Amino acid sequence: MSNQMNTMDITEILKYLPHRYPFLLIDRVLDFTPGESLHAIKNVTINEPFFQGHFPIQPVMPGVLILEAMAQATGLLAFKTMSDDVPPPGVLYYFAGIDNARFRRVVEPGDQIHFEVKMIKERRGIGVFYGEAKVDGEVVCSAEIMCARREINQ
């Protein structure tokens, strides 16, 4: 087994995910093992557009966006499991379902969220994953996430 780290910077992430500002929520992949796991980060700053209304006096990252970022991490793992090549145009992984989502603490400006996702199974283009979001080593959110591979007409 190799000790080589598999990483992705933002330029590489943009080749795999269709999301763009303000909805691209993964900044970097620190490590991944295709078919097994992926570790990504999101740096949360006061400049995030959602903080204007959630909440101006006490800014808190919306939980649904933490889950969306986790789903983006699962999409990256799914793509890297499918092939090491950049996916062809029109191939996407859609957020297909969520189970057992739990929120344990708020995420605030200045936090760095670590997303650790593990592939549980994949069958016929449907992937099932378990993910945790952590800040300073403390779990802030956990969930089981499903994503579905689809080809869209362009």
From Swiss-Prot:
InterPro entries in the record: FabA_FabZ, FabZ, HotDog_dom_sf
Places the protein is found: Cytoplasm
Catalytic activity: a (3R)-hydroxyacyl-[ACP] = a (2E)-enoyl-[ACP] + H2O
Gene3D superfamilies (UniProt xref): Hotdog Thioesterase (3.10.129.10)
Keywords attached to this entry: Cytoplasm, Lipid A biosynthesis, Lipid biosynthesis, Lipid metabolism, Lyase
GO CC annotations on file: cytoplasm; membrane
Positions of the catalytic residues: H54
GO process annotations (BP): fatty acid biosynthetic process; lipid A biosynthetic process
Pfam family, one: FabA
E.C. code: 4.2.1.59
SUPFAM superfamilies registered for this protein in UniProt: Thioesterase/thiol ester dehydrase-isomerase
Keyword Lipid biosynthesis carried by entry: yes
Class of enzymatic activity (EC top level): lyase
Family: Belongs to the thioester dehydratase family. FabZ subfamily.
Protein's UniProt name: 3-hydroxyacyl-[acyl-carrier-protein] dehydratase FabZ
